[in-house]
Amino acid sequence: MMIIRELTPSDRESFFKLTKTVVYALENKDFLIPMTEEEADNTFRDNSKDVVLGAFIDDILVATLGLFHDIRDYTEVLPDNYISLKGAEIGEAMVHPDFRRNGLMNQLVESLQTYILNTPLDYLLATAHPDNISNHLIQKAGFTLLKVFERRGYTRNMYIKKLH
């Protein structure tokens, strides 16, 4: 039975275990920029504004998708008319290799979109390696390609979705 719920600080170890499994299975390791320990400390604290949803099957974390409010990494690549608006990034999209192609990411996207309806956000950002299949899911979710840029030394497509 699958359950989707928000990850808590007690899920941190499971999150990093999933990350390690996903990165190990990737043919192109550039597809995923793993969360750093510092980012995890900020995300998995009790009063964080960030939200990471997890799909659990038999109490095992098999997929994640997060909403991150700290988008300072992107301010220099955003169009000027977005700088004063409230935005967040959708990221940490991972599915365990044994559970891919089962619609888990689509279910996480739907759950996160429901959560986003209750926020004051004006836009969302999403990034993906240009060759990653996730580009199709991002576009299917209504995002528009904004530009190609470098993030932490990795080439990424940056997508944007205006909410209002």
Name each model feature, range by range.
Residues 95, 101-114, 140:
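Conserved acetyl-CoA-binding loop-helix of GNAT-fold acetyltransferases
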Residues 118, 130-148:
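Conserved active-site alpha-helix within GNAT-family acetyltransferase domains
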Residues 90, 124-128:
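Conserved hydrophobic beta-strand within the GNAT/NAT acetyltransferase core sheet
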Residues 17-34:
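Helix-loop element at the rim of GNAT/NAT acetyltransferase active sites that forms part
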Residues 60-92, 100:
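Conserved acyl-donor/pantetheine-binding loop and adjacent beta-alpha core of acyl/acetyltransferases
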Residues 150-164:
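C-terminal "cap" of GNAT-fold acetyltransferases
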